[in-house]
């Protein structure tokens, strides 16, 4: 399923013959619906994080850049590692072979204190040109 909230999943589970295996959701630093992630994980539903780099808008956040520098990685690498440490399947989008290679180089660990900071990072209010989706673009 995609973009199912807890109520949606509960309704589906009442009638479905086969439980969903994956819930693909928008998940990144500044949009971390932990209650939904924990619900899915508790119920054996994998969470797939699409747009872990926040449609590119996270690249404009100096606090995130500073944390990436602390770990000696790029902002996209920090973002991807963050979603992996949450126990999600991460789906970064790129057509650039260099970015693909870099996106796979996430063999570091974000410490617990920094994970909490990232979980509670201020919400990005606009995804710019990528904000065409009414719900996530703040248009509803």
Task: Give short role names for the model-derived ranges.
Residues 1-140:
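Beta/alpha (TIM)-barrel catalytic core signal, keyed to glycine-rich beta->alpha loops juxtaposed to Asp/Glu
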């Amino acid at each position: 399923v995609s973009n199912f909230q807890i109520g949606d999943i509960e309704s589906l589970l009442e009638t479905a013959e086969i439980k969903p295996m994956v819930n693909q959701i928008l998940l990144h630093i500044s949009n971390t619906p932990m209650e939904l992630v924990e619900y899915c994980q508790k119920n054996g539903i994998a969470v797939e994080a699409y747009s872990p780099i926040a449609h590119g808008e996270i690249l404009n956040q100096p606090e995130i850049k500073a944390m990436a520098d602390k770990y000696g990685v790029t902002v996209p690498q920090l973002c991807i590692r963050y979603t992996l440490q949450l126990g999600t399947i991460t789906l970064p989008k790129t057509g650039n072979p260099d970015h693909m290679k870099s996106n796979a180089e996430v063999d570091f660990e974000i410490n617990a204190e920094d994970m909490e900071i990232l979980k509670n990072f201020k919400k990005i209010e606009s995804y710019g040109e990528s904000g065409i989706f009414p719900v996530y673009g703040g248009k509803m």
